[in-house]
Every structure is written in structure tokens, then in C-alpha cells.
Amino acid sequence: MAKTKIAIFGLTGCEGCEFHLLSLDELLLDFFQDFEITNWRLLSKKERADFDVAFIEGAVTTKEQIKLLKDIRETSKIVVVLGACAISGNVFAQLTPEQRKKLAPKIYDKNYKLKAEFLAPVEKFIKVDEKIPGCPPDIEVFKRILEKLKTRKIVSKIKKVAPPDFTEGIEGHGVLKINLKKREAKFVVEESERLVEGLLLGKD
């Protein structure tokens, strides 16, 4: 019997949720025995665009990320948001737009243009099936969701993806580029300021 395929994506945040999963020792070993990981940059796996379940961490901050989320929702049978940033924006949502504008020149060059356009939780843009709260995420909730996934019959959606065939989204400290037509994905590091920039994000 084929294993359920899981993809893990990070939007804008500190990536602590993903690193927290890497520290789970025996639980992580069981995780790999029961599921096939098709996308997870932290494990340096060759990423593919086919998966049944998507775990998403981080807040949404760009239009490109919205497009990525919709593509993920179209492909995935189940979407799970991981951690407080993906659920509510967490500490990144504490600054107002005015505070962000005031602080930006003190951290970056005065002519630096922030990449983030807004801040919103994942659920604002796509339907979410499960939530794992916490910063870092609640491991007991994570375990319960994994048990549900193991016992639940999951059938991959096979749908034609309408143009454009290429999309990208900011993920951690770089950009995840996905070619949906060729079913290929790669991660490109284009900047190193995502963590600090996250602290400057405000609400709509």
C-alpha cells in the first residue's frame, strides 16, 4: 500500500516550527515510516509537486504566497497549518503599519523597500482542515493529527492546473520556485533578511 505523501511549506516567520519537528527524535522516525515526505527543504530533499497532505508554517505576506497557497490547496487533500504564525500571525502581527515604517529605516538602509506587502493568517486565503497551535507547535496535537492521517483513507486529487504553470513563494530565507507543468520544485536563496523583516510586519 502506497504511503500518504506529505509536503511541508514555510511562508514568512522564523522557521522554528519546522526545526521543532526535526528535534522530535523517535516520533520523527515513526513519521518517516508511516508517510512519504515529498517536499521539505530542511531535509534537503529533491522536491516534487505531488502530495496528499500539506503542512504550512508562517504568516502570509505577499501576493505570490497567496498564489502558492491556492496551488497547494488545489493539489492537497488535507491542509494543516503549523504553529501560531500560520494561525494568527503571532508576534509578527503586533506591529502596526505605522510602526513598521518607522522601524524599517533603523534596521535597513533608508532606501530599502520591504518585500512584505501585508500580514495575514493562512486561513484568510484557503480552507484549512487542521490546526496545530503553539510557538513552538503543540506536539500532542501533532501526534493526534498524525494518527488521524494514518487511519484516514486519503486519495490524491488529480486535476489539471490552469496557466500559469510556474509559481513561486517566499519561504524562510529564500524563494521556493515551483514548475507545476514539469512537476518540479527548487529552493533559491535570494536574501538573508526574512527573519528581521518578519519583525517589521504589521496588520492590514
What are these regions (language model features)?
Residues 1-192, 202:
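Iron-sulfur-associated redox domains of electron-transfer enzymes in respiratory
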Residues 198-199:
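Long, low-complexity intrinsically disordered regions enriched in Ser/Thr, Asp/Glu, Pro/Gly
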